Amino acid sequence: MSIRGKAAIVGIGETPTDRLGSKPGEPRKSSAQYLAWAMRLALEDAGLTLKDLNGQGLGVTIPTAYPQPFWPEEVAEILGITPGLLLAGSTGGAGAVSLLGQMSATINSGLIDVALCIGAAAPFSEHFGGGIQPGDMRDFEIPFGTMGPNSKIAMVMRRHMHQYGTTLDHLGRIAVAGRYHASLNPSAYLRKPITIQDYKDSRLVADPVRLLDCVLPANGGKAYIMASPERTRNLRKPPIFVRGFGERSNPSYGPRAASDALIMGVADAGRVAMEMAGVKHGDISFLELYDDYIIVVYLQIEDLGFCAKGDLGFFERTDFTINGGLPIQTGGGMINCGQPSTAGGTIHVIEAVRQLRGEGDQRQVAGAKIGLVTGLGVLPYGKNLGCCAVAVLASDA
């Protein structure tokens, strides 16, 4: 089955990201406020109204702080809409891209012709208690000193360095390119340009992971609106079509007992998405890659087939800026714009839409026609990212 060109993004909305609430006495906003704000911006961008969403699709990314199963229903109440179809982006940071595929298929089925996909979080304003949930983390990781994602990614990063000779200089080129693009993006939270030496000198978090390797937690809300090709006519902005989509969860490369932690599900999901879209690597104008860590961006470039595994020369000679041969993270990514929990993945979708509309301003990729976007979620026990989604977006169907 193909969903190529069966749905398009017609509106985008993102609130500014902030860290209000991290200090006593600071003004705070709730997740509900960020949700309503992001929806209003997306509706305005599309030229639609609230009533256009009633009886239509609503997709909600599930923040890690809200384990309750009825969060999407609560979001519908918060927004004041009555969906005809409700989907949960429950794959962590992959949720925003997963919803692109799910809503495209649903729109193609004829059940709906418009969908709002939205997420928000306010980790610095809202604090939730709770113990460690049963599962691999409690049983197999924490007892041995692995405390959260920084520790896990440190092992992946160290393994790549050991196996392929990867250095901080190779990784730093990605960090510098992302920050350069952030310096051109008024919506970015971190905008001061950095050098590779700045990256190398940033403090250790979990050896060899450094501070400038890590995503920036933040408050904020993000949304996009999708529609059928017929419904896109006479709307405010040109439609950006979903040309291809692929997803893999619980991927395993090699024996289950010794899976290769340096390969992610984007290796398969990317191939499926690109084949559906009918594109090759040279056709893609830019990449918006899920960036909870710099090494994760590095791995995706390899796994998507832009270079061979361990090809250090590719990273030494490739310019990843908007002026180079393979622009990545053209808005700065989550590392520089901030990650409001799982809604952070929507940042990449929104930036891709801006680029394909030609709205990138100083950071516009010249002649951008096709972009590739990824979403990743869950760092499971025994292998790399557990949920991987890839979408190919284009200015034509």
PLM features: residue spans?
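Conserved active-site "lid/cap" helical segment
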Residues: 1-94, 102, 160-167, 189-197, ...
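Extended C-terminal subregions enriched in glycine
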Residues: 260-267, 271-294, 303, 334-341
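Condensing-enzyme catalytic core mediating Claisen C-C bond formation in acyl metabolism
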Residues: 1-32, 173, 204-268, 272, ...
